[in-house]
Amino acid sequence: MEAELPGLLCILQELTQRAELPEEVLSRMSSQRKDIAILVDSYYVTEKYLAALKKRITTIYMDDIYAFSYPVDMLINYNIYGEEMGYEKDAAFADTKLLLGANYVPLREEFSAGAGYVQSRKELSLGAANVTPAEEGGILITTGGSDSFNLAGQLLMEAMKYDALKEKEYHVVSGSLNPHIGELQALAKKHENIHIHCNVTNMAELMAESEVALSAGGSTLYELCAMGVPVIAFSFAENQERLVQTFVKRGIAQYGGNYRTDGNKMIQNTIAGLRKLCGDEALKTEYRRKALQLVDGRGAERIAEALLSEQ
């Protein structure tokens, strides 16, 4: 974002429970230009901390939980439910610029509007004759970096029970901290159609080649939307369920379930949903269309425009 906004100095500081005082942060900025702003993205800041910053400098806060009435100049909540959280009804935000909803999802450059893979998906959604959907593409499975419950492994084993699914290509995205990587690699050795991808740097490419994705709640859902990939979404953490449920409620994703509530049921429902979705071309097309309508890849650009307008 610094490259897009030469007039804006973004100081991204991961605060701890012993965070520096605002005065200490600002003192290190004294030699910089005066027409700058600070972008804060931390759960640890307090109302007092933000108020002190706001007195000295344009203060922007990234939020997703609405913990209290933040004394800031601009508030960004790019979640799909951001507009439903009631910020506008809070008198404390009367003079705060609010950037709410998925129009402001700041995706990485590979997912930005106009990128090659994204453009192909957009053409697909418009029915361009020269674009073919990834009907025989792989099934993408993404469950988070650590996947402590081995959801990917459980989903794969459930899928292998069905003739309609066991011959499909499966691409599992795994982080280096996954304690079950050995089990996944063992499955890949047993089934040549299972591929494990660690420390992925080409996520957009993997998504573009996917027929359907099985994904946990999180920012990956927005990336899948930008790529127009039909998705079956599930949750395994408390902060994921609202996001997943909102996607489902708006008809953008199919619901797999909540692992914390009933793990076996979530695994079975997700694979049952995959069987249904793979055989329903009309439903896949509808999910693609709604996904691309939600995320157009210009979120970072819109945030940049809003930030520059404050200078």
Give the role of each language-model region.
Residues M1-A94:
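Active-site and donor-binding regions of nucleotide-sugar-utilizing enzymes
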Residues V72-F149, I181:
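A nucleotide-sugar donor-handling region in carbohydrate enzymes
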Residues E183-N199:
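Nucleotide-activated donor-binding/catalytic signature segment of Leloir-type glycosyltransferases, i.e.
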Residues A208-S219:
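Acidic donor-binding loop of glycosyltransferase active sites
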Residues T261-A282:
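C-terminal "capping" alpha-helix adjacent to the active site of nucleotide-linked donor transferases
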Residues L283-G297:
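A short, well-ordered alpha-helix in the C-terminal region of glycosyltransferases
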Residues D296-Q311:
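C-terminal alpha-helical cap of glycosyltransferases
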